[in-house]
């Protein structure tokens, strides 16, 4: 049975057909609409899936935000244009006339990455550092989603009580500092207004401010990982996302984590499926895996 998997992120929408063998084919992308209207997202999703839906028997959605009863609740509205209560499952069922499930994108990615691990691992945490910072937790070999879908939203834990205000309404969240949006927001002078990708480019060219911004992000993530180790005693942490997978970033995180006491050290791995983890995880869950 073929699954039409959809990944809804803060900057892009992706869709692909995934067979029972887990192979991805006919992958497509569109920019996430900047408009805050449900109509804009519906139209973009329609354009994305219409060439693919005839080849699928079901739909699986991995989306940023909290997924509750098939609808999108944006913990940080800035990451998805302020959409609230957008009926993801209902919308895709109407567009495709196919049975549909939906799950948070980082939770979906965590499940895919867990399947790729070697050895006897039952405790794993996945972190995505991209437009925002999200996560997924596997404990006892099972994916944790929580009764309200909030499990794994580790980007909204405290990093700095005097830090910037996060889009979720809290002050000093990890996401407000370590994410691509957080890196860009802290840029000043010649880098003011630059996005995270541009800042990474400048850092590679030796720009001191750009390097400091990236180190600040990596240091914040390392402290989060130490907190996660203390909370879950996980056997490994897998890091993905456009920032998390940027050249040299994970090595920086490892350097800062090594400065923490040994009890908080944990193996760090780069995401095996890279940017396709959300798509694959959603498809796996649609194949009958229990949440």
Curated annotation (Swiss-Prot):
Ligase as UniProt keyword: no
InterPro entries: ATPase_NBD (IPR043129), ManNAc_kinase_bac (IPR023945), ROK (IPR000600), ROK_cs (IPR049874)
Binding positions (ATP): 5-12, 132-139
CDD domains to which the protein is assigned, alphabetical: ASKHA_NBD_ROK_EcNanK-like (cd24069)
Pathway(s) it belongs to: Amino-sugar metabolism; N-acetylneuraminate degradation; D-fructose 6-phosphate from N-acetylneuraminate: step 2/5
Keywords: ATP-binding, Carbohydrate metabolism, Kinase, Metal-binding, Nucleotide-binding, Transferase, Zinc
MF terms (GO), sorted A to Z: ATP binding; N-acylmannosamine kinase activity; zinc ion binding
Record's catalysed reaction(s): an N-acyl-D-mannosamine + ATP = an N-acyl-D-mannosamine 6-phosphate + ADP + H(+)
Binding site for Zn(2+): 156, 166, 168, 173
Pfam families documented for this protein: ROK
EC number: 2.7.1.60
BP-aspect Gene Ontology terms: N-acetylneuraminate catabolic process
Gene3D superfamilies, per database record: 3.30.420.40
Role according to the record: Catalyzes the phosphorylation of N-acetylmannosamine (ManNAc) to ManNAc-6-P.
Family: Belongs to the ROK (NagC/XylR) family. NanK subfamily.
NCBIfam families: NactlManKinNanK, PRK05082.1
Assembly notes: Homodimer.
Name of the protein in question: N-acetylmannosamine kinase
Organism encoding this protein: Escherichia coli (strain SMS-3-5 / SECEC)
């Amino acid at each position: 049975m073929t699954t039409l998997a959809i990944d809804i992120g803060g900057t892009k929408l992706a869709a692909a057909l995934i067979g029972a063998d887990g192979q991805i084919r006919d992958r497509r992308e569109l920019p996430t609409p900047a408009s805050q209207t449900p109509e804009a997202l519906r139209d973009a999703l329609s354009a994305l899936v219409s060439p693919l839906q005839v080849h699928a028997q079901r739909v699986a959605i991995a989306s940023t935000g909290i997924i509750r009863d098939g609808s999108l609740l944006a913990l940080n509205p800035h990451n998805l244009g302020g959409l609230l209560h957008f009926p993801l499952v209902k919308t895709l069922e109407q567009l495709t006339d196919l049975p549909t499930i939906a799950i948070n994108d980082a939770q979906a990615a965590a499940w895919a990455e867990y399947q790729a691990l070697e050895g006897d691992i039952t405790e794993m945490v996945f972190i995505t550092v991209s437009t925002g910072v999200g996560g997924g937790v596997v404990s006892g070999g099972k994916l944790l989603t929580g009764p309200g879908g909030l499990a794994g939203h580790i980007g909204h834990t405290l990093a700095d009580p005097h830090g910037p205000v996060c889009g979720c309404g809290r002050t000093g969240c990890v996401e407000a500092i370590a994410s691509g949006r957080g890196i860009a927001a802290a840029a000043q002078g010649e880098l003011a207004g630059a996005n995270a990708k541009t800042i990474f480019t400048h850092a590679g060219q030796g720009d001191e401010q750009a390097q400091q911004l990236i180190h600040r992000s990596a240091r914040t993530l390392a402290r989060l990982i130490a907190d996660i180790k203390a909370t879950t005693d996980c056997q490994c942490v897998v890091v993905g996302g456009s920032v998390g997978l940027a050249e040299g970033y994970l090595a920086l995180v490892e350097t800062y984590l090594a400065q923490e006491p040994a009890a908080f050290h944990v193996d760090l791995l780069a995401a095996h499926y890279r940017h396709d983890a959300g798509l694959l995880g959603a498809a796996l869950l649609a194949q009958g895996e229990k949440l």
